[in-house]
Amino acid sequence: MDTRLINIGFGNIVAAGRVVAIVSPESAPIKRIISDARERGQLIDATYGRRTRAVIITDSGHVILSAIQPETVANRFLTAKPGLSEETE
């Protein structure tokens, strides 16, 4: 079984097959999704204290915060090969 892995910054990696959406954190509905995930204990903050620039939503309901742009994450998602994405932060 080949799993594509996506580098989301600072050495953090996500399984590409589990990603449902990659969105910007600016809108009120996305802020509400982040808040709800925090309350459920399903929020993963991978920003290392930096500004959140991308919100990754998984099929398991987990919400992952990343400090890199959604376009960058999406590009890595589209170009990822099985195993670890060679892009590094």
From Swiss-Prot:
It comes from the Bacteria. InterPro entries: RemA-like. Pfam families: RemA-like. PANTHER family: REGULATORY PROTEIN SSL2874-RELATED, REGULATORY PROTEIN TM_1690-RELATED. Belongs to the RemA family. This is Putative regulatory protein CYB_0055. It comes from Synechococcus sp. (strain JA-2-3B'a(2-13)). The lineage of its organism: Bacteria, Bacillati, Cyanobacteriota, Cyanophyceae, Synechococcales.
